[in-house]
Amino acid sequence: MADYWKSQPKKFCDYCKCWIADNRPSVEFHERGKNHKENVARRISEIKQKSLDKAKEEEKASKEFAAMEAAALKAYQEDLKRLGLPLPSDISEPTVSPVISTVQPTPTSNQQKEKKKKKKKKEASKGGWVEGVTADGHCYYYDLITGASQWEKPEGFQGNLKKTAAKAVWVEGLSEDGYTYYYNTETGESKWEKPEDFIPHGGDVLSSKDSGKLPDTLEDAKSSDSHSDSEGEQKKAGEASTETKKLIIKFKEKNKSTEKRIGPEIQKEKSTPKQNPSNTNEEKPKTLKKSTNPYGEWQEIKQEAESQEEVDLELPSTEGECLSTSEAGVGEIKVVFKEKTVSSLGVAADGVAPVFKKRRLENGKSRNLRQRGDDE
């Protein structure tokens, strides 16, 4: 049997980046060495530092996300308040998820947190929070100093402040034709359909629901206009009321011809005796069934003839600089070719016909071909 050589097994030390013999005495001897211990301690410190940095980054990111959520929630609540929409009950303040860190907090940071808590309690005790009621009847709390709002009752809230009632944004109104529309007092928007967040009040219904009659005459419209003007003056004087009055907005002004037509109709109605209430009730729905176009009526556009006025463009004068094509064509110069006649042909004149001579070739080769020189 032939002899063969077998190598000893090797082991790679990840801390020292070197190869050692894979046996127990060699491994123990290497691990007891000073260089190996220093490398192990250095690796442990690096891992610890990386974990701390990662924890700090996660904490910073969580704080940034919480701040973004708080800002978005605040803007959303402000939009709801501006539009007069009820605040949903499932909205809660964003909470920062705690991040576990191996660094122990210093006593100075604890003192700062305690000071901040005391300041918040003092601000709450001073009466910065105000209790309000939404359109749905839910209570919320609003901070006049910081502008924050929350559903939970804050600490130190006294409860002796005035409650701020949410105002109804949409108001019901009547057009000149007797149709009901809805007007937004904040944005100025008007629509025919009843909005979802419309809040009916006792003072809103002023037309057909209370009196049972539509403003068919101009006198009723004028009285309603004066009534709305007096209400506007009362609001400006400071007599705030939670009930919003119905507004009557004129979409278009009537011409004098329509006013003249309405005049004799009013006189006829006054002169004629009152009919049975059943007949009047039958006539009212007919007037309401009048077809209305929310986009307005078609108008014919008349194109006005534009007056062609000569406008001075202050261009430079072009007199004598360029000629028109017609003038250039007329003034073209004609080229005259001269004819020359040959009187005599030399030898041919003496009665001898001309002879064409051939070229002489040197050594039987044409002259125009390149000849090889002596050097080549």
UniProtKB/Swiss-Prot annotation:
Location in the cell: Nucleus; Nucleus speckle
Ranges where the record places region Interaction with SNRNP200: 357-375
Subunit details: Component of the spliceosome B complex. Associated with U2 snRNPs. Binds splicing factors SNRPB, SNRPC and SF1. Interacts via the WW domains with the Pro-rich domains of KHDRBS1/SAM68. Interacts via the WW domains with the Pro-rich domains of WBP11. Interacts with SNRNP200.
Entry domain remark: The WW domain recognizes the proline, glycine and methionine-rich (PGM) motif present in the splicing factors, as well as the Arg/Gly-rich-flanked Pro-rich domains found in several WW domain-binding proteins.
Gene Ontology molecular function: nucleic acid binding; proline-rich region binding; zinc ion binding
Lineage: Eukaryota, Metazoa, Chordata, Craniata, Vertebrata
Modified residues (Phosphoserine): S228, S230
GO BP: any one term: mRNA splicing, via spliceosome
Gene name as annotated: Wbp4
Protein's organism: Mus musculus
PROSITE patterns named in the record: WW_DOMAIN_1, WW_DOMAIN_2, ZF_MATRIN
Role, per record: Involved in pre-mRNA splicing as a component of the spliceosome. May play a role in cross-intron bridging of U1 and U2 snRNPs in the mammalian A complex.
GO cellular component: nuclear speck; spliceosomal complex; U2-type precatalytic spliceosome
UniProt biased composition (Basic residues): 114-123
DNA damage listed as a keyword: no
Record Pfam families: WW (PF00397), zf-U1 (PF06220)
The organism's place on the tree of life at top rank: Eukaryota
Compositionally biased intervals (Basic and acidic residues): 219-272
Residues annotated as domain WW: 123-156, 164-197
InterPro entries recorded: Matrin/U1-C_Znf_C2H2, Matrin/U1-like-C_Znf_C2H2, U1-CZ_Znf_C2H2, WBP4, WW_dom, WW_dom_sf, Znf_C2H2_sf
Protein name per Swiss-Prot or TrEMBL: WW domain-binding protein 4
Region span, Disordered: 94-127, 192-324
Zinc finger (Matrin-type): 11-42
Bias type Polar residues, positions: 94-111
Keywords, ordered alphabetically: Metal-binding, mRNA processing, mRNA splicing, Nucleus, Phosphoprotein, Repeat, Spliceosome, Zinc, Zinc-finger
